[in-house]
Amino acid sequence: MTRLDSVERAVADIAAGKAVVVIDDEDRENEGDLIFAAEKATPELVAFMVRYTSGYLCVPLAGDICDRLGLLPMYAVNQDKHGTAYTVTVDAKKGVGTGISAMDRATTMRLLADPDAVADDFTKPGHVVPLRAKDGGVLRRPGHTEAAVDLARLAGLQPAGAICEIVSQKDEGAMAQTDELRIFADEHDLALISIADLIEWRRKHEKHIARVAEARIPTRHGEFRAVGYTSIYEDVEHVALVKGEISGPHSDGHDVLVRVHSECLTGDVFGSRRCDCGPQLDAALAMVAREGRGVVLYMRGHEGRGIGLMHKLQAYQLQDAGDDTVDANLKLGLPADARDYGTGAQILVDLGVRSMRLLTNNPAKRVGLDGYGLHIIERVPLPVRANAENIRYLMTKRDRMGHDLVGLEDFDEAVPGELGGAV
């Protein structure tokens, strides 16, 4: 596995006017870009970039900068397979020659990052390619465009970067891959980070949820307080069902019974027996109600362990043909578990949870939440509800995904009822 540097080092280097190397997912472009802050552009930096990259130099910009400078899309209907938002090319109107030299392009880059620049300061077309970054950065789109803008912003600079793909020194007709990028970064004393690490860093260090509403929800397990949240950078809504006082005059937020439940339309709503999601949700509500204090956090966007409803149905189709739940996902080119718990962790912190007893049979969920500063003092198992339709699925979760599901070996399809009984 390729050694990566810290996001903190990359941000510090960007602030100091150095370049960094950023790699994306191997299932996406699988390339590394040389990135520096546009306002720090120098002829030397641009010349270095031209020497070791494809030479197609781009300047990612925050959307409001593109609007202020009148940078319209290069083509009305974006057909780029990765959704890169190219705008019309530009040169600085003053202080440049033909616009193509390292000195000229550095001038244009700095001007694009100048907060006082206006549309009339540029000629179009030109030799620098501005790119429009998605609002929300890598949390909305895991691309180099957004990574460059995020790094500049985190460095305290204008949200404008300079990027270009690094070419292979072994095969000049190809782009450099991860191992070669590590060697390149070491040779030139550059930080090497991944977009995945930048996403994780932002999820840990920035608040990206908003509390929207609270209402009383009477259920068959008693009354809960429903607290609604939105993810600021994603079109996803979540709801926490809260029982009792989590933190306040009479509670310190510690030792809270918590269930983080992933949305499952088929199991939670339709009562599908292919999974145990519906019974787990019901059991969690009952256990929190009996406790008199706790949270059941319902995470939207986690359907099918994060792959979405349609992909889940496609995975079911493969399972009907003989694949297990893990292999079905992999055959679709999807991870066995794509869930991220950063949003859930922020919601729990906002509710006042400081330490908790986590209701789950999935040890990975504990790791996913623990990484965000929440102290998990105990993992409380949920009852196992096996039936003839889900027994193979549950055994796969136990044997291949490490879920702690005790008693599955006692399941007997010939015996009526479900293993686990009523809660």
UniProtKB/Swiss-Prot annotation:
Cofactor(s) named in the record: Mg(2+); Mn(2+); Zn(2+)
Segments for region (GTP cyclohydrolase II): 205-423
CDD domains per record: GTP_cyclohydro2
Record site: Essential for DHBP synthase activity: 127, 165
Binding site for GTP: 259-263, 280, 303-305, 325, 360, 365
Catalysis: reaction(s): D-ribulose 5-phosphate = (2S)-2-hydroxy-3-oxobutyl phosphate + formate + H(+); GTP + 4 H2O = 2,5-diamino-6-hydroxy-4-(5-phosphoribosylamino)-pyrimidine + formate + 2 phosphate + 3 H(+)
Residues the record lists as binding Zn(2+): 264, 275, 277
Enzyme Commission code: 4.1.99.12, 3.5.4.25
Catalytic residues as annotated in Swiss-Prot or TrEMBL: 337 (proton acceptor), 339 (nucleophile)
Region (DHBP synthase): 1-204
Binding site for Mg(2+) 1: 29
One GO cellular component term: cytosol
Pathways per UniProt: Cofactor biosynthesis; riboflavin biosynthesis; 2-hydroxy-3-oxobutyl phosphate from D-ribulose 5-phosphate: step 1/1; Cofactor biosynthesis; riboflavin biosynthesis; 5-amino-6-(D-ribitylamino)uracil from GTP: step 1/4
Residues bound to Mg(2+) 2: 29, 144
Annotated signal sequence range: none
Matching InterPro entries: DHBP_synth_RibB-like_a/b_dom, DHBP_synthase_RibB, GTP_cyclohydro_II, RibA, RibA-like_sf, Riboflavin_synth_RibBA
Family: In the N-terminal section; belongs to the DHBP synthase family. In the C-terminal section; belongs to the GTP cyclohydrolase II family.
Annotated function: Catalyzes the conversion of D-ribulose 5-phosphate to formate and 3,4-dihydroxy-2-butanone 4-phosphate.
This protein's name: Riboflavin biosynthesis protein RibBA
